[in-house]
């Protein structure tokens, strides 16, 4: 759900997902097939750096919207929290949202994790979802996007853990330990 909702386009006209990672685009395709019985293809940009999955056929778009309990009466895009049946559902959702619109900096350089969201109400819903996981994101605006971000290394570690990125969390902790040792030596 997170990958679809935070994709390039999630509307009753079309659902379009873009990623710099072919593996992520392939995951999106496999989830569309598994959850909604929709077979979609991946198109690479001319440079080969962006992979796009588009669903434009009206009946397929309607199937996706119905599966995630969105209807045409909605005036703005928001997270439908009724899609979360369990604690893990929300963590999986956050992982998908991160794959669709998130970025994290290398801990060797800086501590920064962000979600870049074009819609105000959707970004507010994401802040609420993160706060429900006892995280305290900050919000700013950049180039027409709402940026939900973390700068504190411990908050980033917690967010990574919640999203199921345990290895990345431990990698970050190790870098932080090395930095602290170097600073005290």
Feature map (PLM): residue ranges:
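DNA-contacting interfaces and partner/effector-binding or oligomerization modules
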Residues: 19, 26, 30-36, 42-44, ...
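Conserved alpha/beta core segments of nucleic-acid transaction machinery
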Residues: 177-185
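N-terminal ordered "arm"
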Residues: 1-27
């Amino acid at each position: 759900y997170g990958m679809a909702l935070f994709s390039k386009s999630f509307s009753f006209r079309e659902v379009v997902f873009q990623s710099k990672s072919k593996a992520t685009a392939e995951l999106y395709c496999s989830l569309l097939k598994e959850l909604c019985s929709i077979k979609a293809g991946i198109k690479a940009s001319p440079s080969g750096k962006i992979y796009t999955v588009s669903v434009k056929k009206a009946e397929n778009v309607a199937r996706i919207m119905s599966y995630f309990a969105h209807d045409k009466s909605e005036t703005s895009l928001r997270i439908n929290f009724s899609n979360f049946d369990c604690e893990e559902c929300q963590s999986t959702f956050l992982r998908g949202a991160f794959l669709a619109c998130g970025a994290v900096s290398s801990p060797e350089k800086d501590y920064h994790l962000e979600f870049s969201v074009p819609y105000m109400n959707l970004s507010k819903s994401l802040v609420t979802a993160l706060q429900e996981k006892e995280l305290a994101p900050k919000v700013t605006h950049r180039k027409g996007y709402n940026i939900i971000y973390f700068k504190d290394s411990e908050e980033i570690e917690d967010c990574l853990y919640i999203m199921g990125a345990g290895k990345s969390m431990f990698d970050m902790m190790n870098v932080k330990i090395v930095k602290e040792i170097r600073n005290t030596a």
